[in-house]
Amino acid sequence: MGLDIVLFRADKGGNPDLIRQSQKVRYANVDAVQEVIDLDKVVKETKYRLDNTNAEYAKLNKSVAMKKKAGESADEIIAQAEELNQSIIKLKAEVSEVELLLRKKLRPIGNIVHESVPIDNNEDNNQIIKTWGECKTSEGLLHHHELLEMIDGYDPERGTLVSGHRCYFLKGIGVLLNQAIINFALMHMTKRGSVPLQTPFFMNKDVMAKTAQLEQFDDELYKVTGDNEEKYLIATSEQPISAFHQDEWIEEKDLPKKYVGYSTCFRKEAGSHGRDTWGIFRVHQFEKIEQFCITEPEKSWDMMEEMINNSEQFYQELGIPYRVVNIVSGALNNAASKKYDLEGWFPGYNQYRELVSCSNCTDYQSRDLEIRCGMKKQGQQQKKYVHMLNSTLAATTRVICCILENYQTEGGITVPVPLRPYLGKDFIPFVKAAPKQKAIPKQKTTTPEQK
């Protein structure tokens, strides 16, 4: 992943100041921009020396051939050519070394932040752009992990014994509810023209490196080894889908490409603590339905609005109150030029919590993956790369948590209407007592603005 190196070259029509400003609003290393510029010059100078040495070497070889043809000794020229050949070997190694260093310096520099992103380094200041639904509020509403236990929908103790911390067995109605959400989510997107993809669960290291940030390898991704191969379990189906068209030219007439990915996801979730670790809200393994779109560069921003709208409609149909926020510049991951989060209302917590993340990564990923937009036309100076966007539709364990809290009653869980055909019932009764015998009081409702 990374920016176009041409953007760093002011003499070639680039705009280094734009990158510096973007790094500044990301609260990232601005000096890294100059480091890339300086290294780029070293690469060009080293390649220039290599080209000149290759040209001299070719001339000497030609002279050797002429000497031999004339029956004359070419020993002196051959010795000179051998010296040049050794220089060429060293210069090639030097070029490889500085190019590798340049790529390492280039990779941590984030995508250009879109002008509509709020400038701040505190996510408490994310810009609220929309709210929907009525938020239930009441003292004593149960949390999702308590409700999941009361419907006998999971077994965290045995999961921990078998697989470790934050692992679990879904069981009984928990399995069926999980599958109902998957089926409803897939149908929701196929009706909107998306092609379903069930992805591989692991990726080759070199391919993963083109679509994941370096820090993800340590903090998020599980490594799998076998047969002398390094692979990584996926953290989201966005990762394999982004590489689905790698090294391809996609004609404009075949764009946009809309996919809905279905996969199990695996995350270390290093550093997570507190209430995030309760129940199945933030776990090491879960299913997720993901939107992924590929567009012409000029059309990606319209597509971003379409994608977040798809997610909004999904949660509206489920009757989940939510808000959409425009994420502040300092909280953007490197690939995202802009990101929306859709946060669902969790009445047990009396707060909004993230359900959806929708990002426009522009051409930041497609460059490394070499996914180009149309064949290069005559007179066109540079290759044109597609823009790539991703958006959660449903991380099923989180959706289960949100449904349980919003649809809890004194006797059980009311099933949201869209899930009833897939689940075969409209109510899930409690079969276990509330933990600590906590009672569920009568509920009242309020609008998000009244919270």
Curated annotation (Swiss-Prot):
Q: Which PROSITE patterns match?
A: AA_TRNA_LIGASE_II (PS50862)
Q: Where in the cell is it found?
A: Cytoplasm
Catalytic activity reads: tRNA(Ser) + L-serine + ATP = L-seryl-tRNA(Ser) + AMP + diphosphate + H(+); tRNA(Sec) + L-serine + ATP = L-seryl-tRNA(Sec) + AMP + diphosphate + H(+)
Predominant subcellular localization, coarse grouping: cytoplasm
Q: Which domain of life is it from?
A: Eukaryota
GO terms for cellular component:
cytosol; phagocytic vesicle
What are its GO biological-process terms?
cytoplasmic translation; seryl-tRNA aminoacylation
Which pathway does the protein contribute to?
Aminoacyl-tRNA biosynthesis; selenocysteinyl-tRNA(Sec) biosynthesis; L-seryl-tRNA(Sec) from L-serine and tRNA(Sec): step 1/1
Q: Which cysteines are joined by disulfide bonds?
A: none
Q: Could you list this entry's UniProt keywords, alphabetically sorted.
A: Aminoacyl-tRNA synthetase, ATP-binding, Cytoplasm, Ligase, Nucleotide-binding, Protein biosynthesis
Tell me which residues bind ATP: 267-269, 283, 354-357
Positions binding L-serine in this chain are 236-238, 290, 392
Per the record, the domain comment is: Consists of two distinct domains, a catalytic core and a N-terminal extension that is involved in tRNA binding.
Q: What does this protein do?
A: Catalyzes the attachment of serine to tRNA(Ser). Is also able to aminoacylate tRNA(Sec) with serine, to form the misacylated tRNA L-seryl-tRNA(Sec), which will be further converted into selenocysteinyl-tRNA(Sec).
Would you tell me the protein name for this molecule? Serine--tRNA ligase, cytoplasmic
- Summary of subunit composition and partner proteins: Homodimer. The tRNA molecule binds across the dimer.
Q: Is-annotated flag, keyword Nucleotide-binding?
A: yes
NCBIfam families this protein is in? serS
Its Enzyme Commission number(s) read 6.1.1.11
Q: What class of enzyme is it?
A: ligase
Q: Which GO terms describe its molecular function?
A: ATP binding; serine-tRNA ligase activity; tRNA binding
